[in-house]
Amino acid sequence: INWKALLDAAKKVL
């Protein structure tokens, strides 16, 4: 799992 990808997804949801 990529941390940056997870952060990007969270930013999109937020």
From Swiss-Prot:
Gene Ontology MF terms: toxin activity
Cell compartments where the protein resides: Secreted; Target cell membrane
Annotated site location: Embedded in zwitterionic and anionic membranes most of the time: W3
Post-translational modification comment from the UniProt entry: C-terminal amidation is important for the stabilization of the secondary structure in alpha-helical conformation and for activity. The non-amidated analog Protonectarina-MP-OH has a lower level of alpha helical structure than the amidated peptide, as well as a reduced mast cell degranulation activity, a complete loss of hemolytic activity, and a much more reduced antimicrobial activity compared to the amidated peptide.
Record-given protein name: Protonectarina mastoparan
Chain positions found as Leucine amide: L14
Keyword Membrane among record annotations: yes
Family according to the record: Belongs to the MCD family. Mastoparan subfamily.
